[in-house]
From Swiss-Prot:
The keyword Transmembrane helix applies. F-type ATPases have 2 components, CF(1) - the catalytic core - and CF(0) - the membrane proton channel. The keyword Lyase does not apply. Pfam families: Fun_ATP-synt_8. It comes from Vanderwaltozyma polyspora (strain ATCC 22028 / DSM 70294 / BCRC 21397 / CBS 2163 / NBRC 10782 / NRRL Y-8283 / UCD 57-17). The chain crosses the membrane at residues 16-36. It is a single-pass membrane protein. PANTHER family: ATP SYNTHASE PROTEIN 8. This is ATP synthase protein 8. GO terms for molecular function: proton-transporting ATP synthase activity, rotational mechanism. GO terms for cellular component: mitochondrial membrane; proton-transporting ATP synthase complex.
Amino acid sequence: MPQLIPFYFLNQLTYGFLLMTILLVLFSQFFLPMILRLYLTRLFISKL
């Protein structure tokens, strides 16, 4: 069972943490402001 090898566990933990950090940065920098701008645009258009 490779899951019981500590190096395998640390490798999986490191890459999982790295992937979550990269996804968090991408979402906070690019995707969420784009969704917010789209929502605000729809809100302003509907109030006209």
